[in-house]
């Protein structure tokens, strides 16, 4: 599962219902199997567990402070009781290293604005947070991990977006080497 973007939203009845329905889908499975069986009857022979997932990936907005990320992840680990992964951004590398890799080493002509580094967590803030969350997960009998290639804020250089949109968010394969 993937949830976000802030603790208030994650604690909302709608998101809590979604999490509960994925953790225990026994009431919804018969109708879902019937629907899929119309296109693929073999689905009836597949053993589908009622618990579809006990794992959550936390997405937060760019600029979310490390303390808030940690608060949300602790809530998911301790109160909801799910294995939790936190998405972090390549800006953890810092401006010189990230731009050097992206532009010089890999040859991408992409401009990463200074602002992208100003509002995302810094490596020196993220590392202690990750260590504390790993300990929280161990104490709760859960797993904790990070995804280091979430998205990267870059200057809008493509005609796909309106000119008034000054930034766009890069994702996918280009970020894998940065990870």
What residues fall within each predicted segment?
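Glycine/Thr-rich beta-alpha phosphate-binding loop at enzyme active sites
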Residues: 90, 94-179
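The feature marks a conserved, polyanion-engaging helical scaffold used by nucleic-acid processing enzymes
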Residues: 68-95, 99-105
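Structural preference for beta-strand elements that scaffold enzyme active sites
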Residues: 1-21, 28-30, 53-58, 83-87, ...
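A structural motif corresponding to the C-terminal end of an alpha-helix
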Residues: 28, 48, 72-82, 125-144
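Residue-level recognition of alpha-helix initiation/capping sites
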Residues: 67-68, 178
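Long, charged, helix-rich clamp/arm modules that form nucleic acid-engaging surfaces
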Residues: 25-31, 35-44, 82
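Active-site mouth loops of central-metabolism enzymes
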Residues: 54-67, 118, 122
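N-terminal small/glycine-rich loop or linker at the start of catalytic domains
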Residues: 40-56, 101-109, 113
């Amino acid at each position: 599962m993937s949830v976000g973007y802030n603790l208030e939203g994650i604690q909302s009845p709608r998101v809590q219902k979604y999490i509960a329905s994925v953790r225990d889908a026994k009431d919804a499975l018969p109708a879902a199997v019937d629907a899929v069986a119309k296109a693929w009857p073999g689905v009836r022979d597949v053993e589908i567990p009622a618990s579809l997932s006990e794992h959550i990936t936390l997405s937060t907005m760019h600029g979310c402070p490390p303390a808030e990320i940690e608060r949300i992840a602790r809530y998911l680990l301790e109160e909801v009781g799910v294995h939790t992964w936190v998405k972090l951004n390549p800006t953890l590398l810092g401006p010189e290293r990230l731009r050097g890799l992206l532009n010089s080493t890999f040859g991408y002509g992409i401009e990463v604005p200074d602002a992208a580094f100003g509002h995302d967590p810094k490596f020196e803030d993220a590392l202690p947070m990750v260590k504390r969350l790993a300990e929280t997960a161990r104490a709760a009998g859960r797993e904790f991990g990070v995804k280091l290639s979430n998205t990267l804020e870059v200057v809008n250089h493509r005609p796909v977006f309106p000119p008034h949109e000054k930034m766009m968010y890069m994702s996918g394969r280009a970020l894998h080497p940065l990870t």
